[in-house]
Amino acid sequence: MIHKLMRAATVMGLLVVAGGLGSTDVLRADPKPPQVIQSGFESTDQLLKDVERAEKAPLYSAWIVESSRFLNVPHRAFQPDVGDPPFVDLPVNVGIIKDPNGEITLYDSGWKQLAYIFNWNNSCCWKGLRDQMEAIGLDPGDVTRIVLGHGHWDHAGQLSEFPNAVVYIQKEELSQIDFFLDYPVDFNAGHIRAVNTIDPLTGQQVGPPQQACARSPVCGYPPQTVQEILGKTLGGKAKIIDGRHEINAGLIIHPAFRGHTYGSQLLQVNTARGQLVFGSDTYSAWTGIRDWLVANIQQTDTIQQFLAYEKCYVLTSRLNSFDNCISAHEPTTYTAAYPITSNWWNIPNGNCSRAAELILAPGESTHVPANPDRTPPSQCVSVIPPHPIIP
């Protein structure tokens, strides 16, 4: 013990000589943030260089569409630091990015496992992504890439709807899926299964047995979603990457490992309003990244999440800052309160789903209808499945 104290005293003495813990030189000696995987490291200088390079690239157009909507979610379950209002509706947003050549990159793909939507969740307004794109004047046949922010069921559910598109997925995300395929749902005499489907006070079944993992990370990867992802990887339609990856000039993937899942990733897009950064659930709420709030603590490493916030702040620092951070589940999406999504409308024949035009490149015509339907969500909620439940 004495030796340990002496070593500690020696170290503290050296720190004092060097100028203390806050010394600029000390900080310069370790410029990398405390990220857990080497390929996830990106310094501020590296990120700013990506911005400078991207600003010389062609400009992209961007939209989002609402794949579906969670209803009446307890606010503190989504953002523990926020409790007003006590319940919120959360969209499930998909990014659509069009390059000057007309090719389209999707960021996420929404969901398709309708049993999750209408049986196991209080949700509404589902519509197939291809139908949504056609309804707003975009050709699904032009989709050549899908960048998967992460592989959960509400984000990776419609990959197979775009058979010619190549999916960009982090090696770390596949590692997480592999791990969770053997997750011990029945461990300890079925305790995990029991606490998720049985009311401990009455002993009554309160959820379907298939939902037994609802509070464990494995539930993000149900069989249908795993099939969607593995279908692409085994079918030669996936590009498995490890960290930062430049798809094209002005279109760059940045790792956000453990920010939400093992292999979460951001997508930087060069536009006329600066760099947009799509974040999926790494910053599932724009108000979260704006106000530096924890989100979705059940499946998030908070330190890595905040490091992802920092990446978006740096990438958007030259123009519009965090207003250019695009989240998947921001409750104020499709309102003036989330400025970049304020040019929104209800998708025609879209089962009450919505779209927003974020920014147009020069020469791209608007896709907003001449007389857009902006019926408030409270007056347009469809909880009816558009076709029979898919098990």
Could you say what each language-model-derived stretch is?
Residues 67-68, 109-112, 151, 173, ...:
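Active-site metal-binding loops of divalent metal-dependent hydrolases
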Residues 9-20:
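Bacterial N-terminal signal peptides
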Residues 30-33, 264-266, 270-391:
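Cap/insert and terminal regions of metallo-dependent hydrolase folds
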Residues 1-10:
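Bacterial N-terminal signal peptides that target proteins for export
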Residues 26-104, 111-113, 120, 318, ...:
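Zn-dependent metallo-beta-lactamase
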Residues 64, 94-99, 103-105, 114, ...:
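Core dinuclear metal-dependent hydrolase active-site scaffold
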Residues 120-169:
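Active-site metal-binding motif and surrounding structural segment of the metallo-beta-lactamase
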Residues 49-50, 127-138, 142, 171-255, ...:
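Metallo-beta-lactamase
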